[in-house]
Amino acid sequence: MNTLTLEPIARVEGTVNLPGSKSVSNRALLLAALARGTTRLTNLLDSDDIRHMLNALKTLGVSYELSANKTECTVHGLGRAFSSSEPVNLFLGNAGTAMRPLCAALCLSNGEFTLTGEPRMEERPIAHLVDALRQAGAHVHYLKKDGYPPLTIEGKGLWGGEVVIDGSVSSQFLTAFLMAAPLASGDVRIRIRGELVSKPYIDITLHIMKQFGVTVEHDDYQVFYVRGNQTYVSPGTFLVEGDASSASYFLAAGAIKGKVRVTGIGKNSIQGDIRFADVLEKMGAKITWGDDFIEAENVGELQAVDLDMNQIPDAAMTIATAALFANGKTAIRNIYNWRVKETDRLTAMATELRKVGAEVVEGHDFIEITPPAQLKHAAIDTYNDHRIAMCFSLVALSDTKVTINDPGCTSKTFPDYFTKFASVSQR
């Protein structure tokens, strides 16, 4: 196994141009494939999850040209749902942003499609989405364990009507259904059961659908109305924003020990994870907002916070390691959906934070972190989870080094993360 040891960092300073957002990249690629016309996507993320989506689209008959650096892609839209006279097998790795939306889109399509992934993907739930799709006439069969991939879809179209979808575990199920709904044969009314988690991710979906010509009405995120029999229309060009979750590591570093600016997102970003900067501000950092940048600066000792972070689940992980540098006990609440991500992130974060000396309470849907007087050097297990690897790089901002096991797992969303982190680090 590869390891990377980060020596203590005296100060961070500089500017980081963010890679494209994973959430935005895969949504836009799928809609570009279904849309009428040709779409040029710029600042596309080059990472494993995007590669799985691109490979799937190619297998499904979508033609596209990818630039040499893989950050620009011209997609020739089908102007309709997918169709295949032969059975199709798609391997989607551990990419939830490919598995869930493609599952819904393929229910609209003609043909037989089998979706598989890595072993972890077989532990990531998809039942709430499949239940909703079946209500709209889909034929989906689980191949191993009920409620989880792999699965086979007999594509025969979706008929619309009223559908109830559980919103309490992941917003990706609703996102997937929403993106497929305009191509259903009738109008769709989607009612949410339970509390809808990660609402800002639904806003991303609605915003991108609008750019491709489809408007969705909703009653306070409880009922969504989508007209059927529509066709997505290419906007011509589509700029993928910088990834706000990826920004969190650099902003936290600036808040802890220096001054860092991230570019590619700003105050008008469509991504809810920019609200992470507000949490840093509550902890005592100085935050500056621009149209195309966010800057975080340390202006004194950070203070612990006790907050509900349901709306920013990915970026909230970064608060868990920033808490190692805060005065007092930090509590991150209402984050049950950490448990259904790339790994069970609640247990994983608790385990690794204890290794560096923190006192940690792990609850069903919360975590409490009290920093030690002195951080300890530890080898951090990353659980094939990109965000755990990136979060724990912040430990090096102390006077203690940190070793990251399997640092290459950041390739899921940010292949050159450690190079970029080194570019703002002074030793």
UniProtKB/Swiss-Prot annotation:
CDD domains in UniProt: EPSP_synthase (cd01556)
Spans traversing the lipid bilayer: none
Origin: domain of life: Bacteria
Binding site for phosphoenolpyruvate: K22, G96, R124, Q172, R345, R387, K412
Entry keyword set: Amino-acid biosynthesis, Aromatic amino acid biosynthesis, Cytoplasm, Transferase
Catalytic activity: 3-phosphoshikimate + phosphoenolpyruvate = 5-O-(1-carboxyvinyl)-3-phosphoshikimate + phosphate
Chief localisation class: cytoplasm
Binding site for 3-phosphoshikimate: K22, S23, R27, S170, S171, Q172, S198, D314, N337, K341
Gene Ontology molecular function terms on file: 3-phosphoshikimate 1-carboxyvinyltransferase activity
One BP term from GO: chorismate biosynthetic process
E.C. number(s) listed in UniProt: 2.5.1.19
InterPro entries from the UniProt entry: Enolpyruvate_Tfrase_dom, Enolpyruvate_Tfrase_sf, EPSP_synthase, EPSP_synthase_CS, RNA3'P_cycl/enolpyr_Trfase_a/b
Pfam families linked to this entry: EPSP_synthase
Active-site residues, record numbering mapped to chain: D314
Pathway: Metabolic intermediate biosynthesis; chorismate biosynthesis; chorismate from D-erythrose 4-phosphate and phosphoenolpyruvate: step 6/7
Gene Ontology cellular component terms for the protein in this record: cytoplasm
Summary of subunit composition and partner proteins: Monomer.
Chain's role: Catalyzes the transfer of the enolpyruvyl moiety of phosphoenolpyruvate (PEP) to the 5-hydroxyl of shikimate-3-phosphate (S3P) to produce enolpyruvyl shikimate-3-phosphate and inorganic phosphate.
Family recorded in the similarity comment: Belongs to the EPSP synthase family.
Descriptive protein name: 3-phosphoshikimate 1-carboxyvinyltransferase
Organism per entry: Tolumonas auensis (strain DSM 9187 / NBRC 110442 / TA 4)
